[in-house]
Amino acid sequence: MYTHDRSMVAILDWLAAIGAGSAGELAASCGLSPRATGARLRAMEDAGVTRSLRLLHGAPALHVLTRRGLRAAGRPELDPVAVSASGFAHLLAVARVAVALGNAGHRVGGERELRAWERAEGRPLASAEVGLARDGTVALHRPDLVCWGAGAPIAIEVELTVKAPARLRTIVRGWARSRLVGGVVYYATPPATRALRRALRSECAGDRVAVIPLDRAGFLPGFRSTSSIPSAA
């Protein structure tokens, strides 16, 4: 049903990598018309490989892969995305940022994909250390998205709301000290931007962490420190 239909394969691949997206993001990322995207999504949901959820008034439905869909995508190591009312807007924003980065020519992966790769490798690949977990192991913070390329990866965070100041400083400090990534980009709303800038000043992290308005998603700045990142990272 899927391997002979390149557009369905593209939808499977994108949802497996990013996690969730509306029909609009899938159409844009897979090069399909809205009508063609809708027809394929209906067929895929009927076949049990995707499910759709509409939990936010005025927002489009989000589509995610089921376990059957992950197997069809060749990604059985990934867990299905859990969609909640509280996290719906963030998942939608992450999908839109992923499309913008993809349209700008970047290879983009999601947080679940990164988690699976790090589990398989037995080490962090593009995560920040943020202290110790309850069991005494290093606690990791993973970004929402990762831009992969020939050099060090770029961690992408999508910040819609304001985190508690202490928690935000801890995350920013972890990113500032990380030598696994070439830099970190926060695409943020105005309130989140103000909080992030305070955290950046507090942690002297401006050379490693950039804050960009959410409506400019897709733009990636240069980072002066990328040349010091080991190529094996």
Regions found by a protein language model. Give the residues of each.
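Non-catalytic C-terminal interaction segments of nucleic acid-processing enzymes
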Residues: 3, 10-14, 23, 162-173, ...
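A short, highly charged nucleic-acid-interacting micro-segment common to nuclease
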Residues: 78-93
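Amphipathic coiled-coil/heptad-repeat helices and related helical stalk/stem segments
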Residues: 37, 94, 141, 168-171
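Nuclease-adjacent, charged terminal/linker segments that flank catalytic cores
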Residues: 1-82
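Active-site metal-binding core of divalent-cation-utilizing nuclease and nuclease-like domains
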Residues: 53, 85-87, 102, 106-154, ...
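Metal-dependent nuclease catalytic cores in nucleic-acid-processing enzymes
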Residues: 95-102
